[in-house]
């Protein structure tokens, strides 16, 4: 078995992704390898999307998702779009079925290059998110930042898109809040036994949401697809918007539709940056034109 595995450095609206080809191999990417790749400025990432051979009949591939701190993740919508683009460039196919820790999902690349991912159905029961204690209504829970009589943030909506999310609603620019300071505190709050993704959301019209996210295991991010989905369904659930919205994240817009069949569709772009090979055990890597390819901009790292 070859030591090195192929990879592509990509991004989904600025969400930094490494798509790793682990097909035909018995090994997995170690936490040490992930942390080493994350610490290198050229390969720094938010998530690794490791493509493995299928484990379940009817699926094309199993996708293991690894955060930049070496922990495992259940879902990554932006990373899934990157996987689709890489596989479409390789195979000529444009529709795929994947299995992740969060379940089975489907994704399609359109003629305009945008990619839609069926993110599955949202879950709202406190046990399913999960929360550490019973909450009757997850549209608004008791959690706040700041003084009790004048909280900076309070009463977030809670949802799971295969991973836990808390969405704090605000009535001014999302950039006016110090998410880098309170994000890690809220991520690790005792109410979230598996930690949580923390977002600040501002509804700017009946079909538009501005969003910033502190991503569990990754920190501040330019885009988090599952957070955009959680914000969209929570906005509809609380009467702030309809069921089809544009969510503006720092990296750009995502179109989110909460369909009548309860599935959440996310549509957005993916972009290839460069290809290489790496050692899944150590994280040692090099550029290699024979690695996974993709469409999008040229190798910006070669300039």
UniProtKB/Swiss-Prot annotation:
Catalytic activity line of the entry: (2S,6S)-2,6-diaminopimelate = meso-2,6-diaminopimelate
Active-site residues (renumbered): 76 (proton donor), 224 (proton acceptor)
Protein family per UniProt: Belongs to the diaminopimelate epimerase family.
UniProt-annotated site: Could be important to modulate the pK values of the two catalytic cysteine residues, residues: 165, 215
GO molecular function: diaminopimelate epimerase activity
InterPro entries hit by this protein: DAP_epimerase_AS (IPR018510), DAP_epimerase_DapF (IPR001653)
Entry keyword annotation includes Mitochondrion: no
Matching Pfam families: DAP_epimerase (PF01678)
PANTHER family (UniProt xref): DIAMINOPIMELATE EPIMERASE, DIAMINOPIMELATE EPIMERASE, CHLOROPLASTIC
Cellular component GO terms held in the UniProt record: cytosol
Protein name in the entry: Diaminopimelate epimerase
Example of a GO biological process term: lysine biosynthetic process via diaminopimelate
Keywords of this entry: Amino-acid biosynthesis, Cytoplasm, Isomerase, Lysine biosynthesis
Positions that bind substrate: 15, 47, 67, 77-78, 163, 197, 215-216, 225-226
